């Protein structure tokens, strides 16, 4: 995924994308469009805004006027550096609740579900369980070279929010895809485009509306 995203980012910047990394601490509507207040005091204006910040989208949606029961579902990762690959494809250790995925020069082990909010502190016992499960299949592997946790954006009914805000399509939502955000990214982009341009989407979006809660 890293190489793909790097290439996609380069393609977009070559086409004129302006990238700015900052925290959004406020959203306000004006006759000319939406104004976002960024950390540091800078302000950015746009006619339309897409909120697609994954597990961090709930507070942004609230600024836009919608209360959406988005929760952060914490998932854990280990990586083992390898001279030779151990697997030729992703493998699910379903009885132990994790996946093993071959990467360039390494094996990534990821899984578990923990409803622990956006707290960045890892639960060490979950990392231990992943290490223990990996060693069940590959006893020769030593301690993982890297570990981290990530936040999956989860919605109680397991459907993402792909919707205009309740005040109009000047703000459009695209989040809550759980474990399959990259998988659903292409069709989500097509649906978001339809919402932004007020054209007919390829599927009925009522089940994905922010107003269903």
What is each model feature region?
Residues 1-40, 44-47:
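Helical element adjacent to the flavin cofactor pocket in flavoenzyme catalytic cores
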Residues 1-10, 121-126, 183:
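Short beta-strand to alpha-helix junction loop
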Residues 1-10, 112-115, 169, 175-177:
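Helix-loop-beta segment of a Rossmann-like dinucleotide-binding subdomain
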Residues 2, 54-55, 186:
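Alpha-helix N-cap/helix-start capping motif
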Residues 20, 50, 172-174:
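Hydrophobic/aromatic beta-strand patches that form the interior of the parallel beta-sheet core
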Residues 21-24, 144, 204-210:
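Beta-strand segments within the central parallel beta-sheet cores of soluble alpha/beta enzyme folds
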Residues 26, 33-36, 43-44, 48-169:
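Active-site substrate-recognition segment that forms the wall
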Residues 34, 166-213:
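C-terminal lid/capping helical subdomain adjacent to the catalytic/cofactor pocket in oxidative enzymes
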């Amino acid at each position: 995924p890293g190489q793909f995203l790097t290439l996609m980012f380069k393609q977009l910047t070559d086409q004129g994308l302006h990238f700015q990394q900052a925290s959004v601490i406020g959203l306000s509507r004006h006759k000319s469009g939406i104004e976002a207040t960024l950390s540091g005091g800078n302000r950015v204006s746009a006619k339309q805004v897409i909120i697609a910040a994954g597990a961090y989208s709930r507070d942004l949606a609230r600024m836009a006027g919608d209360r959406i029961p988005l929760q952060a579902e914490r998932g854990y990762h280990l990586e083992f550096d390898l001279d030779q690959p151990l697997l030729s494809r992703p493998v699910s250790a379903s009885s132990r609740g994790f996946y093993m995925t071959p990467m360039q020069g390494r094996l990534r082990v990821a899984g578990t579900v923990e409803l622990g909010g956006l707290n960045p502190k890892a639960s060490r016992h979950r990392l231990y369980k992943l290490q223990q499960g990996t060693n069940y299949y590959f006893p020769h592997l030593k301690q993982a070279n890297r570990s981290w946790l990530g936040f999956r954006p989860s919605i109680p009914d397991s459907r993402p929010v792909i919707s205009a805000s309740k005040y109009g399509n000047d703000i459009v939502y695209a989040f809550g895809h759980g474990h399959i955000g990259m998988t659903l990214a292409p069709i989500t982009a097509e649906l978001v485009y339809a919402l932004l341009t007020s054209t007919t989407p390829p599927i009925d979006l009522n089940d994905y509306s922010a107003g269903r809660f």
